[in-house]
Each structure stands twice: as C-alpha cells, then as structure tokens.
C-alpha cells in the first residue's frame, strides 16, 4: 500500500482526512504543530495522539522529506542544497541571506520544458512536475537546518528549477501551506511565483492564490523574446501584458509585478532596448530586476558590463520605473540565477538534440 505524504495536504485536506478517520478537526492543528513548528515527523512521538490514532496514521500516511545529496556553502552565507527524488532526478534550492531577510529559492519541476536559451535548467530538458509534498519538503529541509543556526526564512520564491505555472495544482497547494499560520506563516507579499509567461495560468492565478507575481521578461519586443524565451511564440508580449493587467486589477490590495530582465552583452542591453522597455511597461505597476547573466557550460552568451547595466538602469529609473540590479551571489557553487541544473532524466530529449 502506497502511503500518502502528509506534506501534500493543506489545512482543508487535513481536516477532511481526520474527519474521515472519525477524528475531530482539531487534530489538524495538532499535527501541523508537530510537523511545521516542532519538525517532528515520527507519529510514535506525537504523544497528544492516542496509541490507536498513532497506529492508524502509521498505516495510511507518512511524513517524508527528500534526501540531501549535497549541501554547499560560500562565504557570504549562501547555501545550495542538492536533493534527490530518485537515483535519476535531483533538484536544487538556494538560501540567500541579506541584512533584513532570508530568501529561499525553490524548485517546482525536475528540469524545465520551456528551453529559455540563457538558462542552464532550460537546456537540460524536462522530466516531471514536483508534488506538493516535494515542494514543501524543500522548505522544511531548509527551515529545519536554518533554525538550528538561528537563521530564518522570510521570503520564498518559486525561481528555482521549472516553470511553476505549468504545475499549478501542486504549487498553489504549497502556497496554501506557506501562507498558513499553522505551517510557515509567511505573508502573501513574501511568497513569489515567477513565470516565463504561461498566460492562461496567469489569468487563473489570482482566483487561486494571493501571492506575488514575477515575470521573466528579458526582451522588449516579440522578435527577440521569441528567441530568448520560446514560450513567447505561443503567448505574445501583448497577451502577456494583458494577463499582467488582469493580475494587477484582481487584488484587493495594491500590487506590483516584478519583471526580471537578464542582461546579455550585445543582445538586449542597448539604450534602444531600455527605451523600448519603458514604452512596453507604460501604465503597468512594475518593478524591474536587472540580472547580470551568470555563465554556464556551452552557453553562447556573455554578461553585460557593469557600466552598460548602470546606464540601462538609469534610463529606466529616470522614466519613473523602480529598478534594481541583482547582486550576483552563489555563482561559484552553481547557485546563481539561471545556473540551477540538478540532475534530470530528460524526457524531452533536449540534451540529446544539443549533442547531435
């Protein structure tokens, strides 16, 4: 009998589960305390449950994390974990500490099927969607370790391996737990889903979860974005920006969208590109994150110079667009933006296509 992993259950699902066992719904609060606050996963040690309930839980459900294959550290506090789903598939996550916050960057898929040309994950191909349990296991592994070091996770971003909006059900259930005070208790502004532009899912997102939205933009016209972000061939910039406006109008609180823009030398970093970007985002509550390109094996791209990035940023800033340049961290352990690769049994055969 395959046991269900309780990490896949949000609060409502846990209520239904316990009622199905003939228990009162208050058991949900008790077990969430054990799992998410006390980091206790052994039912036999949950002594506010009767022996018969502990035995029943052991028969039908489990609490299983992922196996930590490797944990890398660098001097400025960045940590990268490599986690095994099975012998063929590994995922990666990154913890980035800053003065007033600690951000955990987690994965939503094994590999990625979107093939963005500047991204190491996209070059690996795709194997599978992660389950809610596999997503939440990442956060539990990190929080359990960081708590022992008196560090904290204040922000969670779906910016690791995979396209979150091609795994909606699991990602939204995970967001329920990230926001739930009985689990991780993060605010909606502290959880961010980053998409390359899966427009139908973007239109559904506001109906399902109130978390923040980031868009991997990287170009200011369809011709260039078709090349850099191939999903643009299916959903154009016009469609993408319409979906962004729907998201902004749906919230009861004032929102903005974070647009991510990787800086590629001689590709998308000219003054003309900056001016076109200003025009493109006119009328949208936007914040732009300029990302120096992080190199990986066999890439055709180089990063823009610091002077070019500064000039680009100044153009946006003087046109009233909030703009920041991401500090590159974790590059020496393959943990910088666009470098997460893990280990993927590629079902798309993209790695084969690149070799032949």
Curated annotation (Swiss-Prot):
Entry binding sites for S-adenosyl-L-methionine: 162-163, 194, 216-218, 294
Cofactors named for this entry: [4Fe-4S] cluster
Main EC class the enzyme belongs to: transferase
Entry function: Specifically methylates position 2 of adenine 2503 in 23S rRNA and position 2 of adenine 37 in tRNAs. m2A2503 modification seems to play a crucial role in the proofreading step occurring at the peptidyl transferase center and thus would serve to optimize ribosomal fidelity.
Name of the encoding gene: rlmN
Active site: 92, 337
Other notes: Reaction proceeds by a ping-pong mechanism involving intermediate methylation of a conserved cysteine residue.
CDD domains named in the record: Radical_SAM
Binding site for [4Fe-4S] cluster: 112, 116, 119
Similarity comment text for this entry: Belongs to the radical SAM superfamily. RlmN family.
Subcellular location: Cytoplasm
Pfam families: Radical_SAM, RlmN_N
Native organism taxonomy: Bacteria, Pseudomonadati, Pseudomonadota, Gammaproteobacteria, Candidatus Pseudothioglobaceae
Catalytic reaction(s) noted: adenosine(2503) in 23S rRNA + 2 reduced [2Fe-2S]-[ferredoxin] + 2 S-adenosyl-L-methionine = 2-methyladenosine(2503) in 23S rRNA + 5'-deoxyadenosine + L-methionine + 2 oxidized [2Fe-2S]-[ferredoxin] + S-adenosyl-L-homocysteine; adenosine(37) in tRNA + 2 reduced [2Fe-2S]-[ferredoxin] + 2 S-adenosyl-L-methionine = 2-methyladenosine(37) in tRNA + 5'-deoxyadenosine + L-methionine + 2 oxidized [2Fe-2S]-[ferredoxin] + S-adenosyl-L-homocysteine
Name of the protein this chain belongs to: Dual-specificity RNA methyltransferase RlmN
One of the GO biological process terms: tRNA methylation
Cystine residue pairs: 105-337
One example GO MF annotation: metal ion binding
InterPro entries: Aldolase_TIM, Methyltransferase_A, RlmN_N, RNA_MTrfase_RlmN, rRNA_lsu_MTrfase_RlmN/Cfr, rSAM
Domain Radical SAM core: 98-327
Cofactor mode of binding and number, as noted: Binds 1 [4Fe-4S] cluster. The cluster is coordinated with 3 cysteines and an exchangeable S-adenosyl-L-methionine.
HAMAP family registered for this protein in UniProt: RNA_methyltr_RlmN
């Amino acid at each position: 009998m395959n046991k269900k992993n309780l990490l896949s259950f949000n609060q409502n699902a846990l209520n239904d589960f316990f009622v199905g066992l003939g228990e009162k719904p208050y058991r949900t609060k008790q077990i969430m305390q054990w799992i998410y606050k006390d980091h206790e996963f052994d039912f036999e040690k949950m002594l506010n449950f009767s022996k018969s309930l502990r035995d029943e839980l052991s028969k039908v459900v489990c609490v299983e994390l992922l196996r930590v294959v490797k944990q890398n550290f660098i001097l400025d506090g960045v940590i990268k974990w490599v986690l095994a789903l099975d012998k063929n598939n590994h995922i990666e996550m990154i913890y980035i500490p800053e003065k007033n916050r600690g951000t955990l960057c987690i994965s939503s898929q094994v590999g990625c099927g979107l093939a963005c040309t500047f991204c190491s994950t996209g070059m690996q191909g795709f194997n599978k969607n992660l389950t809610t349990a596999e997503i939440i296991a990442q956060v539990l592994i990190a929080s359990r370790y960081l708590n022992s070091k008196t560090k904290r996770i204040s922000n969670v971003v779906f910016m690791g391996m995979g396209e979150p909006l091609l795994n909606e059900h699991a990602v939204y259930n995970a967001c329920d737990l990230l926001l739930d005070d009985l689990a991780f208790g993060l605010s909606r502004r502290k959880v961010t889903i980053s998409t390359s532009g899966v427009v139908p899912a973007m239109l559904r997102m506001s109906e399902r979860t109130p978390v923040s939205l980031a868009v991997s933009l990287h170009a200011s016209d369809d011709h260039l974005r078709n090349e850099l972000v191939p999903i643009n061939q299916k959903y154009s910039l016009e469609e993408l920006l319409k979906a962004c406006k729907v998201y902004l109008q749906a919230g009861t609180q004032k929102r903005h969208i974070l647009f991510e823009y990787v800086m590629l030398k001689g590709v998308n970093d000219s003054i003309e590109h900056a001016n076109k970007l200003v025009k493109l985002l006119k009328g949208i509550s936007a914040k732009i994150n300029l990302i120096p390109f992080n190199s990986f094996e066999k890439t055709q791209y180089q990063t823009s110079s610091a002077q070019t990035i500064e000039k680009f940023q100044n153009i946006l800033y003087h046109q009233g667009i909030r703009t920041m340049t991401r500090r590159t961290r974790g590059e020496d352990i393959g943990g910088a933006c666009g470098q997460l690769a893990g280990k993927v049994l590629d079902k798309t055969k993209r790695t084969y296509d690149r070799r032949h």
